[in-house]
């Protein structure tokens, strides 16, 4: 499940990801991406992974499609979690995203927000 975080503002959007993501989750989040891209052009994302279990099969394909569709508009992505495989997921995301991708331990949530708001190159 995706849950938009209230700290989101402007072109910096954060989501809590919990459980196993479904096709319905991706259908629900699409309008959020499109609205932010329409308003700002480029977006910066923060994924807060809490008890994240991965993707159902269709949702894994949706994830790939979203990176293809919206990747050019994603300026950078902060991934916050506490598992080694989540760090590897961040490294894999760098292959699909021209902007910055950085992994933060869950104890570094405020640092992740600051990095996203400031910009990877600043």
Report the location of each language-model feature.
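Amphipathic, Lys/Arg-enriched alpha-helical "gate/interface" segment within cytosolic domains
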Residues: 2-122
């Amino acid at each position: 499940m995706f849950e938009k975080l209230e700290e989101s503002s402007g072109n910096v959007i954060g989501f809590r990801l919990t459980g196993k993501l479904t096709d319905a989750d991706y259908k629900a989040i699409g309008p959020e991406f499109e609205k932010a891209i329409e308003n700002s052009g480029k977006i910066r994302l923060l994924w807060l992974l809490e008890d994240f279990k991965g993707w159902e099969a269709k949702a894994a394909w949706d994830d790939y499609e979203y990176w293809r569709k919206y990747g050019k508009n994603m300026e950078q992505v902060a991934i916050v979690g506490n598992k080694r495989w989540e760090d590897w997921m961040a490294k894999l995301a760098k292959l699909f995203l021209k902007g910055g991708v950085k992994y933060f331990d869950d104890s570094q949530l405020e640092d992740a927000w600051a990095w996203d708001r400031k910009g990877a190159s600043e």
